[in-house]
Structures are given as structure tokens and as C-alpha cells.
Regions:
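Conserved phosphate- and dinucleotide-binding cores of soluble alpha/beta proteins
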Residues: 25-27, 39-198
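HTH-adjacent hinge/linker in prokaryotic transcriptional regulators
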Residues: 1-10, 22, 26-33, 50-51, ...
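Short beta-strand element of Class I
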Residues: 36
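Glycine-rich beta-strand-to-loop/alpha-helix junction loops that act as flexible
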Residues: 12-15
Length: 198
């Protein structure tokens, strides 16, 4: 399980975090997760999520294409909180574990979230691995609080290399299973020792 009862969660915008949010809603409706509060910059699913838990939208400038809020007001509002868990997307992760986004605003938002979270789950499709994007916001490293959640399509050589370097990686049937109960038989955990920090 990525989330436990009482978690205060930041949920990023983007397709993969959206799927995680849907799985989170399913657990809340089923009663397997309770007393959760969510802060999000996503306009895509905040209304639906608010029907099953307490949801707070960040401040910020609307980005219609991404259906989210960003910019300095968003960074400042996020910095007021402390999250027990956070879910972020990634547009790219290079071979050394550097996490990156397509633009500075998205990267700065991610940096701010990492600085104010106890544990961070970066959700990335295996097709984005070993392929850097434009602006970095953190790095997988041994002993850090960031966990990479990806699918079984990750190349074996890359997974072995990252394990040797102490990165923490969870392998699921798909990254969209990230919010589901890890005991439901639909996903498996691959814990290769930990990492990351902005």
C-alpha cells in the first residue's frame, strides 16, 4: 500500500497521477482507506475526489492544456503544508536517476512538494525511463525518501543497475495500480534499496 489511514497526500496533475487518484477513490469508497486529506493542483479530478475525502486545491494560474494550477501562487500555497505522502509525475528520468519535467513551472512545483513531504512516489511509465526531459527537479539516490513506481516494461539491465545503486523501485503491472492495495494480487513490489531528493 502506498497510502495508509490518516495520510495527508499531495496528488499531482497528469495522466498517471489521475489514474492513481481513481484508484485512491476506489479504496476510499470500499472503506479500505479512511481519514485521508488531499491537496492537489489538478482540475481534472478534484471534484470527483472531493466526494469521498477532503480536498484542497492549490492557488495558481490555470494551464488549460494540462488542466492544472501552477506558478508562484501554487508554489507558495503548497509550501504551507506538510504531506505524509505525495504522488508526482515525471516527463523523463535519465540513466542516473535524474527526474525531470518539460518546463520550469512543473519542475519547481515538484521541488516544492518534495521539500514538504515525508515520502514521495514518482509515477512514470517505463517508456520514460533513461530518457531525460528538459528541467530537472530531483534525483533517485540511496537512502532518500523518493520511490519510483513504474511498470514491468522497465529494461532488466536498467533495473539491475538502479538496484545496485540503492534506488527504491516499486514494479506494478502498470503505474496506474500505484494507489491500489498492494495485497490485492494485481501488483507486486520490487524494493531495491532507496532514494531521492530534490
Amino acid at each position: 500500500k502506498l497510502f495508509v489511514n490518516g495520510d495527508k497526500i499531495f496528488l499531482d496533475s497528469g495522466t498517471t497521477p489521475l489514474e492513481c487518484g481513481m484508484a485512491l477513490m476506489a479504496r476510499l469508497r470500499a472503506g479500505t482507506l479512511q481519514d485521508v486529506s488531499v491537496v492537489t493542483n489538478s482540475l481534472a479530478f478534484s471534484d470527483s475526489l472531493a466526494r469521498v475525502c477532503t480536498v484542497t486545491l492549490t492557488a495558481g494560474r490555470i494551464r488549460p492544456k494540462r488542466q492544472d494550477l501552477c506558478g508562484i501562487p501554487a508554489f507558495e500555497s503548497i509550501a504551507r503544508y506538510h504531506f505524509s505522502a505525495a504522488v508526482l509525475g515525471a516527463d523523463g528520468i535519465d540513466g542516473d536517476g535524474v527526474l525531470s519535467s518539460t518546463d520550469e513551472d512543473t519542475a519547481q512545483l515538484a521541488r516544492t512538494v518534495v521539500e514538504h513531504s515525508d515520502r514521495v512516489y514518482v509515477l512514470a511509465d517505463s517508456r520514460k525511463l533513461a530518457r531525460p526531459s528538459f528541467v530537472s527537479y530531483g534525483r533517485l539516490r540511496r537512502g532518500c525518501m523518493i520511490t519510483l513506481v513504474t511498470d514491468a516494461g522497465i529494461p532488466g539491465a536498467l533495473l539491475s543497475n538502479w538496484r545496485r545503486r540503492g534506488f527504491e523501485i516499486l514494479i506494478a503491472e502498470s503505474a496506474s495500480n500505484a494507489g491500489q492495495d498492494g495485497g490485492n494480487g494485481k501488483s507486486k513490489s520490487e524494493k531495491a534499496e532507496a532514494e531521492t531528493k530534490a
